[in-house]
């Protein structure tokens, strides 16, 4: 929980996304932190780990 920016259909950042995290887009962020996250990678058509840099 709390790993991703909420999808557009969630009205508040305080709401929790309860769906499959692998269907969320890979959002790497613009900062330089290095957090491991998971999301759907259309290039490989599967859920994959990626590095999230923080900040939106």
From Swiss-Prot:
A Pfam match: Kunitz_BPTI
SMART domains per record: KU (SM00131)
InterPro entries listed in its UniProt record: Kunitz_BPTI, Kunitz_BPTI_sf
Sorted UniProt keywords: Disulfide bond, Protease inhibitor, Serine protease inhibitor
UniProt keyword Oxidoreductase, yes or no: no
GO molecular-function terms, A-Z: serine-type endopeptidase inhibitor activity
Protein origin, superkingdom: Eukaryota
Chain segments annotated as transmembrane: none
Domain BPTI/Kunitz inhibitor: 22-56
SUPFAM superfamilies: BPTI-like (SSF57362)
Disulfide bonds: 31-55
Annotated site residue numbers, Reactive bond for trypsin: 32-33
The protein's role, per its UniProt record: Inhibits trypsin.
Protein name listed in UniProt: Hemolymph trypsin inhibitor A
């Amino acid at each position: 929980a709390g790993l991703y920016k909420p999808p557009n259909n969630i009205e508040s950042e305080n709401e929790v996304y309860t769906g499959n995290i692998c269907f969320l887009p890979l959002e790497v962020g613009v900062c330089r932190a290095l957090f491991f996250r998971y999301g759907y990678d259309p290039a490989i058509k599967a859920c994959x780990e990626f590095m999230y840099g923080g900040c939106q």
